[in-house]
Amino acid sequence: MSDKQATVLVVDDETRSQDALRRTLDEEFRVLTVSSADEARALLLRQPVSVILCDQRMPGLTGVEFLKEVRERWPEIVRIVISGYTDSEDIIAGVNEAGIYQYILKPWVPDHLIDTVRQAVEAQGLQGDMHRLDLELRTSTPVLRQRSSQKLASAQSAFNFERIVRAPGSPLDAVCEVAARVARYDLPVMVLGESGTGKELLARAIHYASPRAARAFVSENCAAVPDNLLESELFGHKRGAFTGAYEDHAGLFQRANGGTIFLDEIGDTSPAFQVKLLRVLQEGEVRPVGSPRWIPVDVRVIAATHCNLESDVHAGRFREDLYYRIAGVTISMPPLRERSGDLQPIAAKLLEQVAQELARPGLYFGGDALAAMMAYPWPGNIRELRNEIYRAVALSSGEEIRAQLFSRKVLHGQPGTVKRGPHVQTFPQSGTLQERLDAIEAVVLKEALLRHRWNKTHAAKELGLSRVGLRQKLLRFGLEEK
């Protein structure tokens, strides 16, 4: 992001939804809210906006109808629609009719929403420039060639292995050394690691260190998109292929032609989709949905997952032939708790970025804050650390960031009760049955609250409790956000 906060416009006729979206986003973005398409139009005429988050169900125009108008009048704005609809054809129709960047289904998850908006803001900047680089490189104008070269140099400077923050002697040194060697060769790469460890950052560094650096780098989170939409998004579709397909749509494989595609959370794809992806990788060609013709593509694939794919292959959850196709070289990103020496330089860099984005110069960590960060195991890795630093900066009144500004989970988190890897949880091995059940229940409650950023209404709904019932359990177990 730039040194200014990106502006996000929320269009929703329900005040509670507006408030929930604002609370989730306003620590990182400048959030504006309006209740109708008319109010949104008036605002867009007065000031620039980076991203629009629009609810699908509104009086008058639907969200898709309004965003279609936005696409025509303000095409530079990234458009995101939020809806409770679950029909795949409706989702695909909406995405393509209005050129929507992402479709988020209710109930949305705060961390996923924040990540989606971050990626949308980024799509306006450097990556948007890189997608236009191919065209500019083909022009004969020396000025344009020079500008394209400058953009490439800027991207290579922003996304290189040296820019991956770490301490001297970090375990990441070996990771980056292997990745730098692999980058030179046109091999598929599989990046393994927990959520928030920086897998996409490593993938970008590999791309910009490769012979494909001058061509596009595109990414897709496979876990965040329904199967039918994922097929259209990656492979494209023809006009009339399904309801709402009003024009031809080039998929991400075509956009990445000559470059690199990053497929995040590939382990969460369905067996049906895995078959289609395998065909594309084997033959080097894609067939858009509704088209009889195969289109050749030359794309390097970097995939990533938090899953143990070898176990999934043995269990029949992931195709063995696809696994060997995408895992030419496997690189593991260690979690933050296994590289504690990196925590302070990473935290310092994040604080510098947040201070710049929020116009708060001169911030620094107090000794107690550093001690608290070092004592906490960070199950959410760098993403969780970033969120905590945003929270602390937003709550701080002076230049020193103190430990008391961190959330309760950081101040009181116990290393023996956090996740050590995907789907792994440590529980008490002694005590009465009731004591053990109470310990498990407390962990389940805490994890639900963390997922929903301590929104008790959403957590209660997930757990099948009334809000009063959840409140009673929180009091019983002494769970309360500080």
UniProtKB/Swiss-Prot annotation:
Spans through the membrane: none
For binding ATP, which residues are annotated in this chain's numbering?
Answer: 193-200, 265-274
Which UniProt keywords are listed?
Answer: Activator, ATP-binding, Cytoplasm, DNA-binding, Nucleotide-binding, Phosphoprotein, Plasmid, Transcription, Transcription regulation, Two-component regulatory system
Q: Which Pfam families match?
A: HTH_8, Response_reg, Sigma54_activat
Please give the chief subcellular localization of this protein.
cytoplasm
User: What PANTHER family has UniProt attached to this entry?
Assistant: PTS-DEPENDENT DIHYDROXYACETONE KINASE OPERON REGULATORY PROTEIN-RELATED, TRANSCRIPTIONAL REGULATORY PROTEIN
Q: What does this protein do?
A: Probable member of the two-component regulatory system involved in the regulation of the hydrogenase activity. HoxA is probably phosphorylated by a sensory component (which could be HoxX) and then acts in conjunction with sigma-54 as a transcriptional activator.
Name used for this protein in its record: Hydrogenase transcriptional regulatory protein HoxA
Q: Which organism is it from?
A: Cupriavidus necator (strain ATCC 17699 / DSM 428 / KCTC 22496 / NCIMB 10442 / H16 / Stanier 337) (Ralstonia eutropha)
Instruction: Tell me the organism's taxonomic lineage.
Output: Bacteria, Pseudomonadati, Pseudomonadota, Betaproteobacteria, Burkholderiales
**Gene name linked to the record:** hoxA
